[in-house]
Design a protein with these regions (language model features):
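N-terminal nicking endonuclease/strand-transfer module with a His-rich metal-binding environment
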Residues: 1-223
Length: 223
C-alpha cells in the first residue's frame, strides 16, 4: 500500500461539473475522448487511455439521449462530469494493480450513487501528468426525473459524497480531506491544469483543498 513520507497523507480527490445543453455535454465528451485538440495531453501517451463504458462521443451521446426524459426544464442539468484522482505522490508509489483498483472502485462508487445505466462514459486518462478517471453521468432519479439537485445538491450531501468516496478507496492508502476546511473556486479547466502541475512540480495537495461545494459551471469547492 502506498504511503507518503513523513507526515504527508495521500488524499482521494473528486470534483464535478454540471452540464446544461447538449452542446456542452458533447464538447466535454469530445475533450474526454480526445476527439478534439487537447493541449494538456501528451499525444504519445494517449493510446494508454482506456474506457469501460461508451467508446466514443457518439456512443455516449446516444446513451444520454436514451436516458433523458422528453419533458424537462430548458435549463435542466443534462449530465454531471466527474474527475476522480488522488494525490500526485500516491501515483508514484502505487502498483499497476493498485491503480487499476482505484479506477474500478471510483467507477463503482458512481454506479452505486446513480445507477449503473446512468454512467454514460468512464475514461481513464494516462496521457496527462496525473492519472485520473473522467466520467459522465445522467442525474436521472429512479422515478424518471432529471434532478442534479437530488444527487449533489446541498452541502451535507456533498460532504457525504466526499466521505463515502474516500471510504471506497481507503484500503488503497487514501484519506478524505478535512471537513470544514476552506478552498477557493476553480473552473474545471483550472483544475485540470492543477492536476497536470502536480507531478511536474511535485506540489503536494493539502486536505484544505478537498472540502467542496458545487457550482453550476465549476467543480466541487468551498467559499
Amino acid at each position: 500500500m502506498p504511503e507518503s513520507g513523513g507526515n504527508m497523507a495521500n488524499y482521494a480527490i473528486m470534483r464535478c461539473k454540471k452540464l446544461t445543453g447538449m452542446g456542452s455535454v458533447a464538447s466535454a465528451l469530445q475533450h474526454c475522448y480526445r476527439e478534439r485538440e487537447t493541449p494538456n495531453a501528451n499525444a504519445e501517451r494517449t493510446p494508454e487511455n482506456y474506457c469501460s463504458v461508451s467508446k466514443s462521443t457518439d456512443q455516449a451521446m446516444g446513451r444520454v439521449r436514451e436516458l433523458l426524459p422528453e419533458k424537462r426544464r430548458k435549463d435542466a442539468v443534462l449530465a454531471v462530469e466527474y474527475v476522480m484522482t488522488a494525490s500526485p505522490e500516491w501515483w508514484k508509489e502505487a502498483t499497476p494493480r493498485q491503480q487499476a483498483e482505484f479506477f474500478a472502485r471510483s467507477e463503482q462508487w458512481l454506479e452505486k450513487k446513480y445507477g449503473k445505466d446512468r454512467v454514460v462514459a468512464a475514461v481513464v486518462h494516462r496521457d496527462e501528468a496525473t492519472p485520473h478517471l473522467s466520467a459522465f453521468v445522467v442525474p436521472l432519479t429512479q422515478d424518471g426525473r432529471l434532478s442534479a439537485k437530488e444527487f449533489i445538491g446541498g452541502r451535507s450531501k456533498m460532504r457525504e459524497d466526499q466521505s463515502t468516496y474516500a471510504e471506497s478507496v481507503k484500503k488503497l492508502g487514501l484519506e478524505r480531506g478535512i471537513e470544514g476546511s476552506r478552498a477557493t473556486h476553480q473552473t474545471v479547466q483550472h483544475y485540470y491544469e492543477s492536476i497536470n502541475r502536480g507531478t511536474r512540480s511535485q506540489v503536494s495537495i493539502s486536505p484544505e483543498a478537498l472540502e467542496p461545494r458545487v457550482l453550476r459551471k465549476g467543480i466541487f469547492t468551498k467559499d
